[in-house]
Structure formats: C-alpha cells, structure tokens
Amino acid sequence: MPEYPIVQVRSEEIIGDEGMGSKPKFWFNRDGQRWLFKEARDGTGEDWAEKVVAEVARVAGISAATVELAEFSGRRGCASLSFANPDKAETLIHGNEILAGFVLGYDPQKKFHQSDHTLDNIATAIRRMFPEKSHQDGVLAELARYFVLDALVGNTDRHHENWGIVMQAAHKEQAVEMTMQVAPSFDHASSLGRELLDEARGNILALGSIGNYARRGHGAIFQNTTDRRGVNPLELVDVGVRSFPDYFLPALQRLKGVPLQGLQNTVADVPLVRMTEVTKSFVKAFMTYTYDVLTKLAP
C-alpha cells in the first residue's frame, strides 16, 4: 500500500481563519472543496492522530470527517474536509448550543470541568430537539458509535463543542424546510497516546502496562453532574451499556464484526517522517487492548 499523501497547502488557496479551538487553523479551497488546515504543535503527534483515527473510523464503518496529512510553509499539520457547506445553507450546531437550548441551566460557555456534559443530559437534549422517536433513536445510536470510537482510540477531548448536528435550510414554495442530521465525528487529535515521547511509549510496551495507560485518561463527558473529572472513555462506554443499552450494544456488536487487524493496519501507511515505528507499535498495542475490552462488552 502507498503511504498516505501529505497535502501541500498553498497561500493562494487560503479563504479565511477559523476561530473555534485552541490551535492555529485556517480554511482553504482545493478543487472547489473547503478544507480546514490545523497546524500540529511540535512534538504533539496531533497530525498523525487525526489521520489515523479518521482511517480507523472508516474501517469501522463510523461516520467521521475526512482527514489528510498536510503541510503549509514548512509547518506540519492535517487538513479536514468541511462537512457543512454554507453554499448549501448548511450550519453546524455544536453540542453546547444544543444542550443550552434544551437542558435548563446548561452553561454553553464553560470551557473546562463542564460536569453538566453527561450522557443523561445529552440524551435529554436530543429527545427534546427531535420530536419523533425514530429520529431520536437514530441520533443517539450514531452518537453512541462515536463514543465507542473514542474508547477504541482513547480520545479524551469529546467536549461539548466536539459533536453536533448539521442543519440545512431548504426553500420549498412558500416555506422553509429544515433537515437535521448528526455531524460526522471530528477533532480526534487527543487520541492514541499522541502526547507521549517514544521513550515513554517504549517503557509502557516493555512493562506491558498499556492497559493502565488506556484507563488513566479522563474524557470530557461526565458520569454525574457532581463529578470533578470526566469519565475515562472506556468507562463511559461501560456506563452507556448500563444506562442506554439500546444504543451502545448495537455499536459494540458492530465493532465486534470488524477485524482488529484491519483497524491496526491504518498506521502502516503513515509516513515515518510523521510517525515512528515505536509510535506505530504503541498504537497497535493500544487498540489491541481497547478492542478486547470493548468487544467483551458486546453480547
């Protein structure tokens, strides 16, 4: 298999900055498509993490933003294809906006320790947003698949701006018809131990302590509104199985039908200038552990 390409972004393609988030980023137009370039901070692995998780999602059949490795003026990063087209009257409504609109007292501006960001509140907001039960079930099932993906790759940054609904306004005769669907999963840079140095990765592999590492991280979704820290992504799925089995169990059964090797093979085509062999071995071991834990939860 050929290596994943590295898209070279040209300055004349830039069409505007993106204010959301903490990292330098901008929109550019390539062949009539809107892409978001996100610069990877030195030594963080944010670029390869985004690419690998996008490929893991593709193999697992989970809807996720299309991501390519990219470079701009010698600065490494990744490029994410826009899934909300303003030319088609499409708008992304972020989770914090949804929760603030349907959960009493929810603070959409709270950036850290937002303990009201719970599975229960997410489910409540979605059920109030969509009057038809079939639509509610479809949205919640899709979100459950995203949370299973988070657990598989150790994504600890599923905060309330990192999921949402794409709304489209269509003019029909004398009325405006609104359609809404779950946005593809996006923003997976905080995954797969990307923040570790290779020395630390090697030590974890040598000690066989990958499970301890996988269970150490705290996510951005909370189990209870009184908790001080978000729940670990693996533990969140366990909570979901107990609280919302109709959504989480099918997501786990779906994952169980995906061969582990296919998920692991997603790292093979990352160029070594972006991801070392030690890092690739670590990521494979990480997913071996999380896949085993998750598939054991499936009936």
Task: List each language-model region with its residue ranges.
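Conserved ATP-binding subdomain of kinase catalytic cores across diverse folds
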Residues: 1-110
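A broad, structural surface signal
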Residues: 42, 51-59, 141, 145-149, ...
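Short helix-capping/linker segments at secondary-structure and domain boundaries
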Residues: 61, 154-157, 293-298
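Short alpha-helical "patches" and their helix-cap loops
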Residues: 66-74, 159-169, 299
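ATP-dependent phospho-/nucleotidyl transfer catalytic cores
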Residues: 86-147, 270
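C-terminal catalytic region of ATP-dependent kinase domains
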Residues: 170-299
